[in-house]
C-alpha cells in the first residue's frame, strides 16, 4: 500500500446532481471554495452532461467560468461524451472523469448503454483529452455489488477495470456503489488489478 493517499471530493457534482431544488451558481462556487479552504486538493466541480438528464448541473460552464481557481487545487469534471468534452475544454478544465459500471444492468439503467457501448463512447473523449493534455479518471461503479445483479465476482470487476484502463485513463476509481465491500473482497479485487506505476 502507498504511504499516502489522495482524497478526491465529488460532493459538488455527485452530492448535488439529484437535488430537486436548483442550487444557485453562487452557492455552488461557495461550496467548492469552502472545500478548497478546508484543504482538499482535488474537487470534482460538476458534470458536462445534458441539462435534460441532469438539470441541476446545467450551469457547469457558468460555475467553471466564475470559479476562482487556486493553483494548488485540481478542479475536475465528469464528461459523458464528446459534446461534454468540447464544453469542458472550452472552460479550461484540466482533468475529466468518465463513468461506467462492472454490471450490464447498472450500465443500462444508469447511462442507457451496455458496458461495451460505454467504452466505445469514451474512446474519442479520452483521445481528445490526451491531445489536449487533460488528465482522465475512469470510474468503475458496482465493482463489488450491484443493486440489480447482487454480488460482483472480483474477476468480473477486474476485467471491466482493465478494459477501462486500456482506454488510456490515468487513474481508476473503483466504486463500492451499494456499500457492501468487505476487506476480503477488496483484497481479492485489488490483487487482480495491475496498473502502471506512473498511473494510479
Language model regions located:
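Glycine-rich, proline-tolerant flexible connector loops at the mouths of alpha/beta enzymes
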Residues: 41-66, 99-114, 144-148, 173-184
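Distinct, well-ordered alpha-helical segments
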Residues: 56-57, 87-92, 148-157, 182-193
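Conserved, mostly hydrophobic/aromatic
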Residues: 15, 35, 88, 96, ...
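Active-site mouth loops of central-metabolism enzymes
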Residues: 7-28, 72-82, 108-115, 142-156
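Non-cysteine beta-strand/loop elements that form the S-adenosyl-L-methionine
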Residues: 8-10, 94-103, 137-141
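Short, well-ordered coil/turn segments that N-cap beta-strands
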Residues: 3-6, 39-41, 69-75, 93-94, ...
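Glycine-rich, positively charged N-terminal anion/phosphate-binding segment
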Residues: 25-73, 79-87, 92-93
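Alpha-helix-loop-beta-strand connector modules within alpha/beta enzyme cores
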Residues: 53-77, 116-138, 161-162, 185-200
Amino acid at each position: 500500500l502507498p504511504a499516502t493517499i489522495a482524497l478526491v471530493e465529488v460532493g459538488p457534482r455527485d452530492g448535488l446532481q439529484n437535488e430537486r431544488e436548483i442550487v444557485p451558481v453562487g452557492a455552488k462556487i461557495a461550496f467548492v471554495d469552502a472545500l478548497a479552504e478546508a484543504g482538499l486538493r482535488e474537487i470534482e466541480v460538476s458534470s458536462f452532461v445534458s441539462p435534460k438528464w441532469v438539470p441541476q448541473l446545467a450551469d457547469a460552464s457558468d460555475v467553471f467560468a466564475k470559479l476562482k481557481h487556486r493553483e494548488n487545487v485540481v478542479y475536475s469534471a465528469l464528461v459523458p461524451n464528446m459534446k461534454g468534452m468540447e464544453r469542458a475544454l472550452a472552460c479550461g478544465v484540466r482533468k475529466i472523469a468518465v463513468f461506467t459500471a462492472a454490471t450490464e444492468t447498472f450500465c443500462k439503467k444508469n447511462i442507457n448503454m451496455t458496458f461495451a457501448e460505454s467504452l466505445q463512447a469514451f474512446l474519442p473523449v479520452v483521445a481528445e483529452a490526451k491531445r489536449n493534455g487533460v488528465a482522465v479518471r475512469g470510474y468503475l461503479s458496482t465493482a463489488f455489488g450491484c443493486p440489480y445483479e447482487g454480488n460482483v465476482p472480483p474477476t468480473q470487476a477486474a476485467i471491466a477495470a482493465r478494459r477501462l484502463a486500456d482506454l488510456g485513463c490515468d487513474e481508476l476509481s473503483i466504486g463500492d456503489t451499494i456499500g457492501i465491500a468487505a476487506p476480503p473482497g477488496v483484497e481479492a479485487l485489488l490483487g487482480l488489478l495491475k496498473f502502471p506505476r506512473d498511473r494510479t
